[in-house]
Amino acid sequence: MSAENNQLSGASPPHPPTTPQYSTQNLPSEKEDTEVELDEESLQDESPFSPEGESLEDKEYLEEEEDLEEEEYLGKEEYLKEEEYLGKEEHLEEEEYLEKAGYLEEEEYIEEEEYLGKEGYLEEEEYLGKEEHLEEEEYLGKEGYLEKEDYIEEVDYLGKKAYLEEEEYLGKKSYLEEEKALEKEENLEEEEALEKEENLDGKENLYKKYLKEPKASYSSQTMLLRDARSPDAGPSQVTTFLTVPLTFATPSPVSESATESSELLLTLYRRSQASQTDWCYDRTAVKSLKSKSETEQETTTKLAPEEHVNTKVQQKKEENVLEFASKENFWDGITDESIDKLEVEDLDENFLNSSYQTVFKTIIKEMAAHNELEEDFDIPLTKLLESENRWKLVIMLKKNYEKFKETILRIKRRREAQKLTEMTSFTFHLMSKPTPEKPETEEIQKPQRVVHHRKKLERDKEWIQKKTVVHQGDGKLILYPNKNVYQILFPDGTGQIHYPSGNLAMLILYAKMKKFTYIILEDSLEGRIRALINNSGNATFYDENSDIWLNLSSNLGYYFPKDKRQKAWNWWNLNIHVHAPPVQPISLKINEYIQVQIRSQDKIIFCFTYEQKQICLNLGTRYKFVIPEVLSEMKKKTILEAEPGPTAQKIRVLLGKMNRLLNYATTPDLENFIEAVSISLMDNKYLKKMLSKLWF
């Protein structure tokens, strides 16, 4: 507030108000303000007339300005007397005006006026109460400025009463009516507040108090400055701004500059009043009233000059209604102008968005309903049947299937035929099919590999099963008299036999396909192996020095006794006269408890005896009927021929493959092979040299 008061005291404002046509404005002096306000009112009212009337009126205004300059120094007493007289006339004329216009009959506007008058009056009192202290201090220090403030107060709160004096001099009653209508516009809020209190005398006293106190000038000027800074510009603002004449482009005299600045301030003040609107409140009513006023304004231009007064009065009445309906609260509008503008924009955007969304939703709903209707037609009849009806149909079909079998099959064939007809197939027949040319390739005859399946001897599994019954037990321990384990045999044929000392004598193992392995051990803690025997015809016995004592296979047998003649025989060739099995048996005594006798392939008897206890097992094997071809081969096998081991057998196979490759390879292939081998050998030598250099 202090900054605004300092600006009003005569200093230029730091941020001058901006308007669409003027970039900068200077505050006028006291006398200039009065002249500007009076001239602006006359110019605004006479703006709808023709350009010739405007030029005459401009001359009259210049004369009026000279008269007003003479009357400025008459004093406060004359204005106070005129105020009382004019105040009474104002109230009488306003009542007549209100009765004619019919505003008193409209209850809605009266309620709005009462509400707005209450708020505006209370806020003005609060605002004036806050500024009393600051304004009184400035009032004491500035006596010369008080006269200016008094004059400005008279002009602001008397409702442009100077226009009434000018009209009395000119004798224009129609102009008085227009001025009274304008007074009603500016003082409507204060009058409604006084009407609520039902004290017209109190209203006059308040006006006099306002006139006497200089604080009102500050408030009025601050109001004008705030309105000048407001950025809002509605349709009513544009029309009021255009009424300002542009003939004051050369501000040589002081009165012309004052008039221009005062006119701008008053136009901004009215623009701010028009902008203090809530567009959400009776927006349609305001638009209708405005359109009505515009149409009536167009009709007034066509009427005679005598009818201009009545049309202008009617236009002023409608503009009065517009401004009254748009003003909710003057002080709230000053402080919240930008906020109201943002709210209006948000409202418009929300309104458009909501209408667009509703239309979009309705379209989608219609499309969905249309799709649902289309889907209803595609529902098969089976889905429409209820569960009970379907169940009944199934029962009837089961009972009467034979009767309707032919019809059901006919329907199925028809449906299948329909499905086949729906599937279209295009077939193309060429006149002549091109025969694919096969590349000529030299046929290389590969050698036919003859695979000789090795015929093996097959064991007699039935005989082996009967033989193993002997050493199948129930898994019970049989002990010696000294409580050591004697033997334990299990139902699957496995078991153990122990010496009286407790050492293991024989271990019987079982593998798949009824393959048993018998291991005979020495009676010692070391437990050296004395014999390995299996039921496939292979066996090896070792003497005390761990040398081979006897070796048996499926074809041959070797016996290497000490200090005796060695024997070798073929089990399948009995023409060789050798004193060996199966002609002559061989007995081997391993220790005092174990003795083995070899009679034939199927009779290798193992005996374990201790005092009166004895266990005898047959460790031999028997083969099925041998084919003569196999038998002849087995007979031809020499006795001293060594059977190759697994590694030797692999080497023999590889050598045979190499032999076959060399037989069918050509000389160029061999030459290429030799070159590749020589290169690889050279590379190996070079690598070895490099490695040797690296190490050393």
Swiss-Prot record:
Residues 1-10 have a biased composition (Polar residues). InterPro entries: FAM194_C. Residues 32-44, 54-72 have a biased composition (Acidic residues). Residues 73-91 have a biased composition (Basic and acidic residues). Residues 1-105 are annotated as: Disordered. Belongs to the ERICH6 family. This is Glutamate-rich protein 6B. The lineage of its organism: Eukaryota, Metazoa, Chordata, Craniata, Vertebrata. The gene is ERICH6B.
